[in-house]
Amino acid sequence: MASSQRITLDQWKKKAAKVELNDTQKQEIKEAFDLFDIDGSGTIDLKELKIAMRALGFEPKKEEVKQLIAEIDKEGTGTICFEDFFAIMSVKMSEKDEKEEILKAFKLFDDDATGSISLNNIKRVAKELGENLTEDELQEMLDEADRDGDGEINEEEFLKMMKKTSLY
């Protein structure tokens, strides 16, 4: 995810240009911004950035907000314009949607609702899909994603594995 590495404002804007948001999402970003742009200047106070992000359903960590501010506020004005806010929130919303889709897939595997995917879960899905894989091949798939070595794939491990693929 973008929050774990340094990313420049230009990189945010390039990523945002590739994002397709629906009209409702665009409106939500605009409304969150306008809520804090009380004087209509087209900018919001950087202290309000965290609150505006929360209004859009994000729980940004203090460190993430500091990092965003360092990248956005190069001139030290203490404000962020709508264009920059929109670019950042567009990327954040697309990442959130992506995560939700991956977690839906996780739940399809985790049909016994244990919070993790076992070898038996993978066997069932492979059978349902008509995949003729040996137990060794299925075990290899599980081992590839099982980072903590507990013999099962939890949500975090599944998210990491899926983000490495070109599917998401």
UniProtKB/Swiss-Prot annotation:
GO molecular function: calcium ion binding; G-protein beta/gamma-subunit complex binding; heterotrimeric G-protein binding
Tissue expr: In brain, specifically expressed in ciliated cells. In retina, expression is localized to the connecting cilium and basal body of photoreceptors (at protein level). Highly expressed in brain, kidney, lung, retina and ovary, and weakly expressed in spleen. Not detected in testis, colon, stomach, thymus, skeletal muscle, heart, intestine or liver.
Keyword hit for Calcium: yes
Record flagged with keyword Repeat: yes
Modified-residue entries (Phosphothreonine), positions: T134
InterPro entries, alphabetized: CALM/Myosin/TropC-like, EF-hand-dom_pair, EF_Hand_1_Ca_BS, EF_hand_dom, RNA-helicase_DEAD-box_CS
Positions that bind Ca(2+) 2: D146, D148, D150, E152, E157
Coiled-coil portions: none
One Pfam family per UniProt: EF-hand_7
Keywords, comma-separated and alphabetical: Calcium, Cytoplasm, Cytoskeleton, Metal-binding, Phosphoprotein, Repeat
Membrane-spanning ranges: none
EF-hand domain mapped to chain residues: 24-59, 60-95, 97-132, 133-168
Any one GO cellular component localisation term in the record: ciliary basal body
Processing and modification events after translation: Phosphorylated on Thr-134 by casein kinase II (CK2) in a light-dependent manner.
Places the protein is found: Cytoplasm, Cytoskeleton, Microtubule organizing center, Centrosome, Centriole; Cytoplasm
SUPFAM superfamilies, per the entry: EF-hand
Subunit note: Interacts with G-protein beta-gamma dimers in a calcium-dependent manner.
Family of this protein: Belongs to the centrin family.
Function text: Ca(2+)-binding protein that may be involved in basal body assembly or in a subsequent step of ciliogenesis.
Domain notes: The fourth EF-hand domain has been proven to bind calcium.
Record protein name field: Centrin-4
